[in-house]
Amino acid sequence: MHMPVAGPHTHTLFTVSRTMLTVVAALTPATLFGLWEFGWPAIFLFLTTVVSAWVFEVACLKIADKPIRPFATDGSAILSGWLVAMTLPPYAPWWVGVIGSFIAIVIAKHLFGGLGQNLFNPAMVARAMLVVALPVQMTTWIAPVGLLEGPSFLHGLSITFLGSQEFDAVSSASTLSHIKSQISAGATMGEILPTLADLESRLLGFVPGSLGETSTVLLALGGLLLLVTRIITPTIPLAVLGTLVTLSAICSFLAPDRFAPPILHLTSGSTMLCAFFIATDYVTSPVTTAGKWVYGIGIGTLVFVIPLRRLPRGRGLCGALDELGHAPDRNLHPAADLRTVPHRQAACAAKPAKGAQK
């Protein structure tokens, strides 16, 4: 009797928990910057969102009768809650964060079987559903004034947990929202660009936006950490950013009065968060190199095209599910792998092991 021979095992220092911890570390600089710039309301919202995500994780594990300790401490729930919090307006009410965590953990993750079984990135599902269900709360932007100059501790509690509206006096439009409104009013890009924040402010993050998405530099540095530690490969980020730059450069050259230059796309919204942290999600992205290129180009194209349709925060998270616009691209990744897997590899995978049928 012939017994099938087990395949070789790949060993790595990066367990699930270590991988999640590394991603959290990469997100930390941009997150801390956002918390400092937007102050106490952002801090309270962030903590509420992350803690509620972990609580929902434990509850789902308990209901499913799964071991709580290994899954609740692997960092996946914390990371999902962290990403949800980073995509929220900094002065959003506490219940927006809790609902976002519920959607991410209960609906987008455990409803499909838990870690590794989700069809879409849980945080992006939460973001998409929140934008559709709560457009006002999800499109209210605040100009960053710093922790010391912003609302006090007690005032921050009032804003986050009691719904105080006193902050309306300092509310502002995000870069993308401002451009859309001005174009709708008939202004040209040449007239709009001088009214935007300068390049330095957009790079560093001194602009209105979501809690952890404003600093292009810090998010890019976090992405570089993921590349250096080999948590991700450069293929998908290069495909996303390269496609976005190429399309915006062509359109800006052909119609400069209507289309923004590439640098504005790279420093607006959450392009870097998308390219390095969302599009590279292990579960929802391809594994073959060619598949990653196809997948990244698809996301980069959608990131450029969706704002042209006047959808709210169309670039938003630049991920596969942002405002539901990127959902089809996430669903295509198995097809991208199937079409791009080497023929020899596919043939070997289809051939039964010697003696397996005996």
Swiss-Prot record:
Family according to the record: Belongs to the NqrB/RnfD family.
Name this polypeptide is given: Ion-translocating oxidoreductase complex subunit D
Source superkingdom: Bacteria
Protein purpose: Part of a membrane-bound complex that couples electron transfer with translocation of ions across the membrane. Required for nitrogen fixation. Involved in electron transfer to nitrogenase.
Gene name, Swiss-Prot/TrEMBL: rnfD
Subunit structure: The complex is composed of six subunits: RnfA, RnfB, RnfC, RnfD, RnfE and RnfG.
Keywords: Electron transport, Flavoprotein, FMN, Membrane, Nitrogen fixation, Phosphoprotein, Translocase, Transmembrane, Transmembrane helix, Transport
Up-regulation conditions: Expression is reduced under iron-limiting conditions.
Membrane topology designation: Multi-pass membrane protein
This enzyme's EC code(s): 7.-.-.-
Gene Ontology biological process terms from the UniProt entry: electron transport chain; nitrogen fixation; transmembrane transport
A Pfam family recorded for this sequence: NQR2_RnfD_RnfE
Cofactor: FMN
Enzyme class: translocase
Record's GO cellular component terms: plasma membrane; plasma membrane-derived chromatophore membrane
InterPro entries: NqrB/RnfD (IPR004338), RnfD_bac (IPR011303)
Cell compartments where the protein resides: Cellular chromatophore membrane
Residue spans crossing the bilayer: 16-36, 38-58, 68-90, 128-148, 206-226, 236-256, 286-306
